[in-house]
Design a protein with these regions (language model features):
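Membrane-proximal intracellular helices of multi-pass ion channels
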Residues: 1-483
Length: 483
């Protein structure tokens, strides 16, 4: 049986936490003397009331969550956070349409960064701060935050972590996962704070620095400017953000190794080497192409290509140039990068590099099997044999990922959306990327899409952020059977 009471209680606790975030954003509104503080107070009152009710209704539940409970909790938590998180946008009239308000909030909490706003600079500071905060909270995971504080309430967070996490196959979940989660949040917060300081040194004011730091470490890509990072026209800011986007694309368990000075173990990691090599490879190709086919000089070609490759590789979605003005062959390369993603166990979306490593090794072994039919060729990563069941899961995930992309592109096309735009929107959403192709590229918003398309893309953002199986399991009859 699903532990309904405990799940309800945890959702209530999360809503109370979301209320405190609303109050923080209202403080920003008051600081700037803008009227959006009322929207946060109203949203906070509604959210707190529902949260307290759920906490009361959830008393007396079994505090030990099963794995099945974890899957339900993760999906429901994300949807609940989005439904209540959209209230400041909707109540304040800043996004008066429910579909658009839900889309914008889901885009934030899934760290996608696709926006329907056509006038970002016209929004009040509190609303922009909340918009930026959604991707920072969603980046590492509402549930990662949950399991760090669940032990305080006597609830085990282990099964929640197993459901939400996209840790790589060779990583083991620590038995005291709450401690691990707190360490990861400490690193996450420290990286964010350091980036704020560096951006301020580059000329950004404190507000824009915090918002862009949230967007960078959360790999969300929401900017406070319609032109994104290109607005600042600053090589310093572009290089700094590039470095921190790359860092945020690294598995956080590897960053903990760095903090603990276990450099050899960190830099020998197969996934990290693949990630770094991929960034170097694509940056080189695109930089050389831009140098010979555009008016850019050598440094600018390198900087623009490095920034865009890392931005799309980490599913951040910031832009310093409209890549739709680049040669069409580069659109294909950028689309491949969108699908690949960065490291598992990071704030990024996409297939993840660890799956690419496994697919590469499986393909290589199959070629060898043709030459040596009787050879036993296990897949090894970091000198450890990957279990056949894990390989099967990776293959199934990739097949399902591609199938959903193809089916969604066909659905989008059936709605009258251009084929290039359909491809860009679908891949961008399921990979939690942000900008797409064509009329949904980095220079445009997604406001012109029909409502049905926005609901479909919101669903793709959710399943992409939660690694497909977490959500899709809920639609299988077997999941709900008692045994």
């Amino acid at each position: 049986m699903i532990n309904i009471k405990t799940i309800i209680r945890i959702i209530g606790i999360l809503l109370l936490l979301e209320t405190t975030m609303f109050l923080g954003c209202s403080g920003v509104s008051l600081y700037y003397g803008e009227g959006d503080s009322f929207a946060f107070w109203k949203a906070g009152a509604i959210t707190a009331g529902i949260g307290l009710l759920l906490v009361a209704l959830g008393k007396g539940g079994n505090h030990q969550l099963t794995r099945r409970d974890g899957y339900v909790l993760v999906s429901v938590a994300w949807i609940a956070f989005t439904l209540f998180g959209m209230l400041p946008f909707y109540i304040g009239g800043y996004i008066p349409d429910i579909t658009n308000a839900f889309f914008e909030t889901m885009s934030g909490f899934t760290s996608t960064g696709a926006t329907i706003l056509d006038n970002i600079e016209a929004q009040p500071h509190g609303i922009l701060f909340w918009r930026s905060m959604t991707q920072w909270i969603g980046g590492l995971g509402i549930i990662m935050f949950t399991i760090a504080i669940l032990p305080i309430f006597g609830v085990s967070g282990l099964q929640v972590f197993a459901a939400e996490s996209s840790v790589s196959t060779h990583d083991k979940v620590h038995p005291r996962i709450g401690i691990t989660a707190k360490w990861i949040w400490s690193v996450y917060t420290s990286i964010t704070a350091l980036l704020v300081i560096l951006l301020m040194l580059g000329g950004m004011d404190w507000f824009d620095s915090i918002c862009h730091a949230f967007a960078t470490t959360g790999t969300g890509g929401f900017s406070t400017k319609q032109a994104s990072v290109a607005y600042y026209n600053s090589p310093y800011i572009e290089y700094v953000i590039s470095i921190f986007m790359f860092t945020s694309g690294i598995n956080f368990t590897l960053l903990l190794l760095f903090v603990n000075r276990k450099f050899k173990k960190m830099f020998s990691n197969a996934e990290l080497k693949f990630y770094f090599g991929s960034v170097v490879f694509f940056t080189t190709i695109i930089a050389v192409t831009l140098f010979y086919t555009s008016p850019m000089g050598a440094e600018e070609s390198f900087r623009k290509s490095l920034f865009q490759v890392i931005s799309l590789h980490t599913s951040t979605g910031f832009a310093t140039d409209d890549y739709m003005n680049w040669k069409p062959v580069l659109w294909g390369l950028l689309t491949i990068i969108m699908v690949m993603g960065a490291c598992a166990g990071s704030t990024t979306g996409g297939l993840k590099c660890i799956r690419m490593v496994i697919l590469t090794k499986v393909s290589r072994n199959e070629i060898k099997h043709i030459i040596h039919p009787n050879a036993v060729l296990p897949v090894r990563i970091n000198k450890q044999v990957v279990a056949p069941s894990t390989v099967s899961t990776v293959l199934a995930f990739c097949f399902l990922y591609i199938t959903i992309i193809v089916a969604s592109i066909l659905l989008m096309s059936a709605m009258g959306i251009g084929f290039a735009e359909s491809i860009g929107c679908v891949i961008s959403s399921i990979s939690n990327m942000g900008p797409g192709l064509g009329e949904t590229g980095p220079a445009y918003s997604w406001s012109a899409l029909p409502d049905l398309a926005k609901w479909l893309l919101s669903f793709l953002m959710l399943i992409g952020r939660l690694e497909l199986f977490t959500v899709l399991l809920l639609f299988t009859p077997e999941f709900w059977r008692q045994n």
